[in-house]
Amino acid sequence: MPIPNNPGAGENAFDPVFVKDDDGYDLDSFMIPAHYKKYLTKVLVPNGVIKNRIEKLAYDIKKVYNNEEFHILCLLKGSRGFFTALLKHLSRIHNYSAVEMSKPLFGEHYVRVKSYCNDQSTGTLEIVSEDLSCLKGKHVLIVEDIIDTGKTLVKFCEYLKKFEIKTVAIACLFIKRTPLWNGFKADFVGFSIPDHFVVGYSLDYNEIFRDLDHCCLVNDEGKKKYKATSL
């Protein structure tokens, strides 16, 4: 697989793990914080499964970039858990390779993006970032938590064009099977999940539930409890 450079096309992408519509686990089977439990329906993807899948994604990414230097953009805040685990595995895989390099394999950068209030997209994208002009002529991998409608990544990739980046690829932990999806595909995907609002593993509902270890479904009571006052 060549280094991807057609954001949204998902050309030559590996298949994600498919989570069926009726998949899930009883909350009592896992360690769930007591203050969250009544606001959740079920565990959709357990923490251990998420971690192992991220390790495999790191392996796939390393195979594609091989020993080419690349820069990883973390889209905060939802991607933080995925990004941290991915970097850990990429570093370990690279450190155990026999190749000597004069510089680190990858650089890391952080961009704050926000497009949701409650469980709805606001239709606008707020971007706060460091100076990304250093990415000119570089390979860039965007790390996103979830592709829902796909609108966030379309707008963000458009934003990146002014920096004259060499290649742009996308890694996302989850892609949601929703009729609202605009067709934007990632190049490295962890899981294909059903059309439900998910929280946990750094995914939030109005900044709540990020600290859940597992990917879970939030129920209507939870949405009402933590609903923002305005869109």
UniProtKB/Swiss-Prot annotation:
Q: How, per the record, is the cofactor bound?
A: Binds 2 magnesium ions per subunit. The magnesium ions are essentially bound to the substrate and have few direct interactions with the protein.
Where in the sequence is the active site?
Answer: D148 (proton acceptor)
What are the EC numbers?
2.4.2.22, 2.4.2.8
Q: Some GO term, biological process aspect, for this entry: which one?
A: IMP salvage
Subcellular location as annotated = Cytoplasm
Q: Which UniProt keywords apply?
A: Cytoplasm, Glycosyltransferase, Magnesium, Metal-binding, Nucleotide-binding, Purine salvage, Transferase
Q: What InterPro entries does the annotation carry?
A: HGPRT (IPR050408), Hxn_phspho_trans (IPR005904), PRibTrfase_dom (IPR000836), PRTase-like (IPR029057)
Q: Which cysteines are joined by disulfide bonds?
A: none
Q: Does the keyword Glycosyltransferase apply?
A: yes
Task: Return the CDD domains for the record.
Answer: PRTases_typeI
Q: What do the Gene Ontology cellular component annotations say? A: cytosol
Q: What class of enzyme is it?
A: transferase
What is the catalytic activity of this protein? IMP + diphosphate = hypoxanthine + 5-phospho-alpha-D-ribose 1-diphosphate; GMP + diphosphate = guanine + 5-phospho-alpha-D-ribose 1-diphosphate; XMP + diphosphate = xanthine + 5-phospho-alpha-D-ribose 1-diphosphate
Q: Which cofactor does it need?
A: Mg(2+)
The record's section on Gene3D superfamilies has:
3.40.50.2020
Q: Quick one: which pathway? A: Purine metabolism; GMP biosynthesis via salvage pathway; GMP from guanine: step 1/1; Purine metabolism; IMP biosynthesis via salvage pathway; IMP from hypoxanthine: step 1/1; Purine metabolism; XMP biosynthesis via salvage pathway; XMP from xanthine: step 1/1
Q: Which family does it belong to?
A: Belongs to the purine/pyrimidine phosphoribosyltransferase family.
The record describes its quaternary structure and partners as: Homotetramer.
Listed name of the protein: Hypoxanthine-guanine-xanthine phosphoribosyltransferase
Its source organism is Plasmodium falciparum (isolate K1 / Thailand)
